[in-house]
């Protein structure tokens, strides 16, 4: 009988040690789980690029009496990692919109907008006096685009990852790049006794 109680106790102890725990963390806190691109990197890049663009003397001049309309192209991922560049793009767009200096057109929703306008104008279900007419949208004046690249170096003990984010703002009428900047992140990871 004592053996069964002891075995049950040991089994309960082992199983309780295998259970996972979930907790909330501060999304602004720096996460350093590994050298891969993470949430801290996304926040750093979005913050630095937004601040650089808003504080650029040329863009201060452009936005002093006008809120230019911008089309934001999804950031291109030129790293070897799977990085959700849509999240980076969304964070930058959101911060710029919240600055109150820019307005945006969302090219990712063109088909849905077209479907809605077709429904309103051709379906016969919407009062024609209240339907939004085709050809009333405004076009973008500027295009914001960029890419995220990385260089990875490893040796027996260390893995070093360098990330570089480059962005540009182009005047769509003239083709002139009005603003460009880049920000960098470098991370290093030392190999433990049992591997990466």
Where is each model-derived feature located?
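N-terminal segment of the mature soluble domain
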Residues: 48, 52-125, 174-180
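Bacterial signal peptide processing site
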Residues: 19-22
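A short acidic/small-residue loop/turn micro-motif
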Residues: 185-187
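C-terminal motif of bacterial Sec signal peptides marking the signal peptidase cleavage site
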Residues: 15-17
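A short, hydrophobic beta-strand-centered structural micro-motif
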Residues: 49-53, 69-74, 123-154
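C-terminal binding/interaction regions
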Residues: 166-168
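Post-signal peptide N-terminal segment of mature Sec-exported envelope proteins
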Residues: 26-48
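Bacterial N-terminal signal peptides that target proteins for export
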Residues: 1-7
